[in-house]
Regions:
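Canonical AAA+ ATPase core
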Residues: 179-183, 205, 209, 217-308, ...
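C-terminal engagement/docking regions of AAA+ P-loop ATPases
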Residues: 77-87, 330-412
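Short beta-strand-centered segment that lines the nucleotide-binding/catalytic pocket of NTP-utilizing
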Residues: 157-169, 226-230
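Pre-Walker A (pre-P-loop) alpha-helix and adjacent loop at the N terminus of AAA/AAA+ ATPase modules
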Residues: 96-133, 138
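Walker B catalytic acidic pair
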Residues: 200-201, 212
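Conserved C-terminal "switch" segment of AAA+ ATPases
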Residues: 94-97, 112, 249, 263-336, ...
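Conserved alpha-helical scaffold flanking the Walker A/P-loop in AAA+ ATPase domains
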Residues: 179-198
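Walker A/P-loop
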Residues: 128-164
């Protein structure tokens, strides 16, 4: 459990209280199989979400009734029988089946990274929730090592971009090169066209270079010249940055900061962890090897289950209350108006929902509890709540504001 802020345990309901919630609904759908026998498949009721083992079209489906029929019949979803509700137990079983790679991946990460449990958990959550992650900390805290280890443990394309003050946007997205032989332009794609992109020390480059990532991070596509190219289905930007007080750094544009699902503060290791680091790394010949544990396809399948994790209406309202409390704290009886310059954007609502579902997934549950939301609130919101000059003068941070909101709002 995350202990970064004090929680009133008496206000967190027992998990049994959530068992009576209406179960998530699913749609029964037919799908064409190789044996041509009509079978049933599940869609969890989300427009872009399918059961983790099958890929289905939410709006229509095809049925091949027999080997003699060569033309599939396309039927509208409107003519189908009412959907059957999926029980919490069935959701839990789906989570258990699709999370087989979580434990081996954590063990592989811990082989090279000592301590930093919260960092590792946050990286996995960003992977499952299909959101980008920003790591902030002083140099030497294994930020880059953690991201490189994660990328190596996944069977996917990985590119590293070392941000420097003299970079150009074309160094990231690519450019068009004139070909005098054929008298035309050819497109040379940049390192952003990968499954995993490590933006190392992203705030070492000026804003115009940092902004080259904006389109790819939000729309999962990149425009070079007059051509637009899609990015891979599994696409994750993992960025590191040094605190802004460090010499030679540039603040990230607000539009880019808001595109990161999580901002994780990487802290120094404990004395016991540092002793283990000394024992393992105290040699001039350090050999760090990483085994591939999971494929991009497995991650894609797990994401479908994460999207289907059930969230009760009261839990959804709790998320909305947290976000709105950052914009209008007086409405919730909080005297924080003078300390908040800007509250969280709607992206905060979406990302807090997705990361809470991923947190439930890694804990083996098919439903979200208020504790999942509290666990993720700081990482999702700390870079979305801008504090005023009064707050800075009094030493009040966005984390202090978020913590007070979490400790004040009633828990469903």
């Amino acid at each position: 459990m995350d202990t970064r802020h004090q929680l009133n345990e008496s206000r967190v309901p027992d998990i049994g209280k959530l068992t009576h919630i209406p179960t998530a609904s699913v749609d029964k759908q037919h799908r064409v199989h190789k044996d041509s026998n009509p079978t049933l498949d599940f869609d969890f009721g989300y427009p872009s979400v399918t059961y983790f083992e099958k890929g289905l079209n939410h709006r229509s489906f095809t049925v091949e009734h027999s080997r003699s029929r060569k033309t599939p019949i396309t039927t509208s979803m409107e003519n189908q029988t009412p959907p059957r509700k999926l029980t919490i137990q069935e959701l839990n079983e789906s989570v258990q089946r699709s999370s087989f790679w979580l434990r081996p991946l954590k063990e592989e990460l811990h082989r090279n990274i000592i301590g930093q449990e919260h960092l590792i958990e946050s990286l996995i959550i960003s992977l499952l929730a299909n959101g980008h992650v920003l790591l902030e900390g002083v140099p030497g805290l294994a930020k880059t090592l953690a991201l490189k280890t994660l990328a190596s443990a996944v069977l996917a394309d990985f590119r590293r971009i070392q941000f420097t003050p003299d970079m150009l946007p074309a160094d990231i997205i690519g450019t068009e090169i004139y070909n005098p032989k054929d008298v035309n332009f050819i497109t040379k794609k940049g390192p952003i066209f990968s499954n995993f992109v490590l933006a190392d020390e992203i705030n070492r480059a000026p804003a115009k270079v940092q902004s080259a990532l904006l389109e790819g991070m939000q729309e999962r596509q990149v425009t070079i010249g007059d051509q637009t190219f899609p990015l891979p289905d599994v696409f994750l930007v993992m960025a590191t940055q040094n605190p802004i007080e460090q010499e030679g750094t540039y603040p990230l544009p607000e539009a880019q900061v808001d595109r990161f699902m999580l901002k994780v503060i990487v802290k120094h290791p404990t004395p016991a962890e540092e002793r283990l680091i000394l024992d393992r790394m105290g040699t001039s010949e350090v050999n760090l090897t990483v085994n591939s544990i999971v494929s991009a396809k497995d991650i894609w399948r797990s994401r479908k289950v994460v999207n289907a994790v059930f969230m009760d209406d009261r839990v959804k309202d709790y998320i909305v209350s947290i976000i709105h409390a950052t914009r209008d704290p007086a409405h919730y009886g909080l005297k924080l108006k003078d300390y908040i310059l800007n509250g969280a954007s709607p992206r905060g609502t979406i990302f807090l929902t997705l990361s809470s579902k991923a947190n439930a997934f890694i804990n083996g549950r098919g439903f979200v509890t208020p504790e999942d939301i509290k666990n993720q609130a700081l990482d999702v919101l700390r870079h979305r709540v801008a504090v005023s000059y009064e707050a800075e003068a009094e030493g009040i941070t966005s984390e202090d504001i978020i913590t007070q909101i979490l400790n004040t709002l009633p828990v469903p």
